[in-house]
A protein has these predicted regions:
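Single conserved hydrophobic/aromatic residue that forms the stacking wall/gate
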Residues: 1-5, 9, 233-241
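Glycine/small-residue-rich loop that forms an oxyanion/phosphate-binding "nest" at active or ligand-binding sites
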Residues: 52-81, 87
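Conserved phosphate/ATP/ADP-binding segment of small-molecule kinases
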Residues: 73-154
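Short, well-structured alpha-helical segments that form the helix of a local strand-helix-strand
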Residues: 127-132, 189-204, 224-225
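Short, small-residue alpha-helix embedded
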Residues: 166-198
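Charged C-terminal helix
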Residues: 202-236
Length: 241
């Protein structure tokens, strides 16, 4: 239901504690992104999460930079304890931090030592399944090779371009889009999460195809956004999963 997702993906953004409950009530899905943390935004995240759970809305946690600081790690872990999430979406370092309670993340990017590769793929799959079972929700680990698991099944997705890692915000964009896909397909959450990852990867490939000599990563970012906007035209493009 990609067309339904496009209708859902009309977002409202708020981090003010007095505002988030009302905004959450009129939205079909909640994406909690911890990219900007302070006392006020943290309070707003917990309030929004509680309201979304009350209403039975789909919820997603994007633990941006978890492992880079104690505040980020502790906030993400506490959110997992107090809010019922349908999906946790992050890079491998962020997700490992949630699983272990500490990490080696030096920012919002995954540590090279943690990367999922063809050589350690089986280990990565086992980790994704185990953490999904422990967390009680779908886990989407994104990187050069993407893993999406509900604890029983694990989708392995190889779409995308290495240059996507040089653009700040592609992961956050994916989390927003994934929330919309889940809100449009609440009975097929695992498939919706995997479809969002495939769509983002395809957008990266399609966008790269329009790059010209002299274009840089700012242009590429906009090409990706354009490709997502035009995704219904390219919906028949093959995915590798």
């Amino acid at each position: 239901k990609s067309s339904a997702a496009s209708d859902v993906y009309k977002r409202q953004m708020s981090d003010e504690p007095e505002d988030v409950k009302e905004i959450t009530s009129i939205c079909q899905g909640l994406n909690i992104n911890i990219g900007t943390l302070n006392k006020r935004t943290i309070e707003g995240m917990f309030a929004a999460g509680a309201r979304a759970n009350e209403l039975g809305h789909v919820t997603l946690l994007d633990p941006v930079g978890a492992g880079a600081s104690g505040l980020r790690t502790n906030t993400a872990v506490e959110l997992m304890e107090k809010v019922r999430f349908d999906v946790i979406r992050g890079n491998i370092s962020e997700v490992k931090t949630l699983a272990q309670g500490s990490g080696t993340t030096k920012g919002v990017d995954a540590d090279v030592a943690d990367a999922v590769t063809e050589e350690n793929l089986e280990e990565g799959i086992a980790f994704a399944k185990a953490f999904a079972k422990k967390a009680g929700c779908i886990v989407a680990i994104t990187g050069a090779i993407d893993l999406v698991s509900d604890g029983a099944t694990c989708y392995i997705i190889r779409n995308g371009r290495p240059e996507m890692g040089k653009i700040t915000g592609t992961g956050c964009q994916l989390s927003g889009m994934m929330t919309a896909f889940l809100a449009a397909n609440p009975e097929q959450k695992l498939e919706a999460a995997a479809a969002a990852v495939c769509t983002m990867g395809l957008a990266g490939e399609i966008g790269w195809g329009y790059m010209q000599k002299g274009d840089g990563n700012a242009t590429y970012r906009n090409r990706i956004i354009d490709a997502i906007y035009l995704s219904l035209i390219h919906i028949s493009e093959p995915t590798r999963h």
